[in-house]
């Protein structure tokens, strides 16, 4: 979504909406695949009348068109403790995503994360606006404050799905990413240079997309996927027609068969229509 389907204002353009509807009218299944939690992903979608399945939290949660949860992959206690030990040792700030919300120990440090997200989406990052957004999340309960992340596992029914770590020291982030990647049960990706998105190894966009394709009896070679960042690579590498946004990272462009326009200029819609027009 961010950097791909959404523009800098976190909106889905009419061109993108119309292209998705056109694809659906041809019997094509369109799936949202995002690092966002469902309650974040569904907000911009609510401004449209689109009905689609969702791959959320990089594949940690899959929902059908009616929002029913079809599959989840969470981090067990041992993995959570290993992640926390590494991040705490390196003094790297992180948020914990669960099946019910996002947890923070220090909302003042969340500002850095959301400024980074804004920059990644092509915004300069209005500090006061982002502060207001953080407060809104706290007020509506999607961003929850805890004294200690250990308290989360004591809450009945709470499952830890993803850890989002952030640090402006890119060398440190890269080093930590390599250390975490060495843990076989973890998948480590990123949605910008300054962050790490840590999930269970079963929770990857590519794995979730393959599962959906198999359920629909669709060959992955007949699937098109679009993305802009490293958390899209597992998906783009699996499909027959990988598409990179013009604003994508070089590593993403390197594996694409097509480079479409930017997220600011409805690159998703343009790519969909290009492929469907060529098929005619």
Region annotations inferred by a language model:
Residues 38-42, 172-174, 206, 232-233:
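Short, well-ordered alpha-helical microsegments
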Residues 27-31, 51-52, 162, 221-222, ...:
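Short active-site oxyanion
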Residues 14-124, 128:
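Active-site phosphate-binding/coordination module
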Residues 1-9, 83:
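Asp-based phosphoryl-transfer active-site loop
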Residues 90-92, 98-226:
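Conserved acidic, metal-coordinating active-site core of Asp-based
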Residues 23, 34, 58, 163, ...:
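Residue-level signal for inorganic ion chemistry
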Residues 5-7, 13, 45, 181, ...:
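Mg2+-dependent phosphoryl-transfer enzymes with acidic/Ser/Thr/Gly-rich catalytic loops
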């Amino acid at each position: 979504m961010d950097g791909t389907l959404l523009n800098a204002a976190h909106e889905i353009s009419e061109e993108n909406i119309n292209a998705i509807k056109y694809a659906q009218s041809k019997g094509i299944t369109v799936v949202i695949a995002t690092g966002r939690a469902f309650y974040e992903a569904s907000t911009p979608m609510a401004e449209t009348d689109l009905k689609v399945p969702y791959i959320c939290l990089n594949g940690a949660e899959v929902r059908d068109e009616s929002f029913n949860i079809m599959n989840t992959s969470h981090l067990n206690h041992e993995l959570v403790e290993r992640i926390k030990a590494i991040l705490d040792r390196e003094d790297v700030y992180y948020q914990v995503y669960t099946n019910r919300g996002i947890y923070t120990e220090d909302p003042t440090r969340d500002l850095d994360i959301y400024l980074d997200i804004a920059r990644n989406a092509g915004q300069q990052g209005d500090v006061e606006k982002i502060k207001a957004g953080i407060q809104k999340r706290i007020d509506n309960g999607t961003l929850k404050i805890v004294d200690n992340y250990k308290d989360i596992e004591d809450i009945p029914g709470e499952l830890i799905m993803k850890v989002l770590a952030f640090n402006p020291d890119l060398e440190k982030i890269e080093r930590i990413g390599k250390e975490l990647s060495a843990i076989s049960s973890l998948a480590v990706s990123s949605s910008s240079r300054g962050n790490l998105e840590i999930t269970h190894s079963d929770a990857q966009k590519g794995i979730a997309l393959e599962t959906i394709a198999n359920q629909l009896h669709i060959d992955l070679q007949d699937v098109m996927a679009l993305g802009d960042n490293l958390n899209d690579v597992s998906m783009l590498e699996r499909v027959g027609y990988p598409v990179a946004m013009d604003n994508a990272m070089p590593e993403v462009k390197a594996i694409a068969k097509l480079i479409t326009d930017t997220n600011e200029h409805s690159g998703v819609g343009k790519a969909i229509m290009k492929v469907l027009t060529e098929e005619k």
